């Protein structure tokens, strides 16, 4: 029930910004370590476009963003060399992503987005009332 509520809030929020989210067409939960490694390896000026394309591929078209071919296609569409997408599958890159995730977890961050308001942490998709409560506490 909690996951369903989060999905519904995300879909409604997306609609409000003209961004359709199609959780109903997502058939797999891909391994996202290579996608995270690709974002980390991308030049700063290309990261935002890359992240947008990754999100669109997964949340709007249900693509497997853990697949080498799909990731290479997204990389080139974002202005990156396809070879960089292959580097994202390097075990050392995966280890670096996992280390960053472990560090984040140790800091108490459990989801994205993550907000800390007045000592209170809000993780993942939240009802607007959760923000009001945190801001007025």
Question: What do the PLM-derived regions correspond to, one by one?
Answer:
Residues 44-137:
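C-terminal cap of thioredoxin/glutaredoxin-like
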């Amino acid at each position: 029930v909690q996951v369903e509520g989060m999905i519904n809030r995300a879909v409604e929020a997306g609609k409000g910004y003209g961004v359709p989210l199609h959780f109903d067409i997502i058939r797999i939960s891909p391994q996202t370590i290579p996608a995270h490694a690709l974002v980390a390896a991308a030049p700063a000026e290309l990261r935002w476009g890359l992240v947008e394309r990754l999100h669109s591929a997964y949340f709007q078209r249900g693509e497997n963003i853990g697949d080498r071919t799909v990731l290479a296609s997204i990389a080139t569409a974002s202005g990156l060399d396809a070879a960089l997408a292959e580097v994202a599958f390097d075990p050392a890159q995966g280890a670096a992503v996992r280390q960053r995730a472990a560090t984040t977890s140790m800091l108490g961050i459990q989801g994205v987005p993550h907000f800390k308001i007045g000592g209170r942490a809000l993780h993942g998709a939240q009802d607007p009332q959760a923000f009001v409560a945190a801001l007025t506490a």
